[in-house]
Design a protein with these regions (language model features):
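Extracellular carbohydrate-recognition regions
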Residues: 1-72
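Disulfide-rich extracellular domains of secreted proteins
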Residues: 1-3, 7-22, 48-49, 57, ...
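Solvent-exposed loop and beta-edge segments used for protein-protein assembly and interaction
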Residues: 8, 119-129, 148-152, 252-257
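Short N-terminal edge-element motif at the start of the domain
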Residues: 69-141
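Low-complexity, polar-biased intrinsically disordered regions enriched in Pro/Ser/Thr/Gly
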Residues: 95-101, 140-148, 241-250
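Well-ordered, non-membrane alpha-helical segments in soluble/globular domains
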Residues: 106-113, 154, 233-239
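Short helix-loop boundary/capping segments
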Residues: 126-128, 132-234
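Long, compositionally biased interface segments
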Residues: 208-288
Length: 288
């Protein structure tokens, strides 16, 4: 069997294109990179944020790194054998020290990549997701009473999409989630429901304990390694979507391919959070 890395530039050595928070198609994306970088393969998304990192100056960060800061966020990259990306968000600044209402949009800070050649599920024997993360202990404004809709989630999503051109369901997709942290819980809970943030697509996220089987709670402040064949869970996600009435024009697994990935923070309340990421990988183990 052949193993193929699906991600381009998994160490982020070539930086990012950065889209503005609320009008990603209104102007060309900004360039966030460092000396000797080439054309970026990644997008940096900052949906619904109140500050735009596109306008911040690049600063040196330690002996081998660079950083970009706004009042509400910080992006930091450090070179090395295993380059490290850090994403910081200050929800107290993002929400002006107030509590977000449950129907209001929430701030994101994500990295995103469209795969150059989507890989069909039917061609896979395994799909191996791997990374190392270090999520710092979070803090909140102690004067504010957080509700259940106020949280910070550090997670990845992979789109499982119908890529059969000419098919009635072409382009329809499933969000498949890989949760690391949900600050409401010791470990993130399973989630299977339609997206309320705009896409309207089905989200299938197994629980944190499905991934981190040795932990009772997520170990904040420590490097945690994840290596997992996620293909069986993707199949379970498609089945759940069909049962829930989604993807009804695409009721055939052979239509679907791995299409894109994003990873980062979704911040729905006034929490201050930070996480580091290194050794990211998405490997297709192809059938013989």
């Amino acid at each position: 069997m052949t193993t193929k890395e699906l991600l381009r530039d998994p160490g982020f050595r070539n930086g990012f294109y950065v889209t503005p928070p609320n009008n990603p198609h209104g102007m060309p994306p900004a360039l966030m990179c460092w000396p000797e970088a080439s054309t970026p393969d990644w997008m940096l998304r900052q949906w619904n944020s109140t500050s735009d990192v596109s306008w911040s100056w690049m600063q040196e960060y330690g002996p081998n790194g660079f950083r970009w800061d706004t009042e509400g966020k910080s992006i930091r990259w450090t070179a090395g054998q295993s380059p490290t990306l850090e994403l910081h968000m200050d929800g107290i600044a993002e929400y002006g020290g107030k509590l977000r209402t449950p129907d209001a949009p929430w701030a994101h800070l994500l990295i995103e990549q469209e795969l150059a050649q989507p890989t069909l599920l039917s061609a896979l024997n395994e799909l191996r997701f791997g990374c190392e993360t270090n999520v710092k202990p979070f803090r909140s404004n102690g004067d504010l009473r957080l509700e259940n809709w106020h949280t910070a989630q550090w997670q990845a999503f992979i789109t499982i999409q119908n890529r059969e051109k000419g098919h009635p369901g072409y382009g329809d997709f499933l969000w498949f989630g890989i949760p690391f942290v949900d600050t409401r819980y010791a470990m993130p809970k399973r989630h299977a429901a339609g997206d309320t943030a705009g896409s309207g697509k089905f989200i299938y996220t197994p629980s944190g304990r499905d991934y981190f089987t040795i932990f009772d709670s997520y170990p904040y402040g420590e490097w945690v390694s994840l290596q997992r064949d996620i293909l069986p869970m993707i199949d379970a996600g498609l089945t759940a979507a069909w049962k829930a009435g989604f993807l009804q024009k695409s009721r055939d697994r052979r239509l679907f391919a791995i299409s894109s990935i994003n990873l980062g923070w979704e911040l729905t309340g006034p929490l201050v959070v930070a996480a580091s990421l290194r050794n990211l990988s998405l490997q297709a183990v192809l059938r013989a």
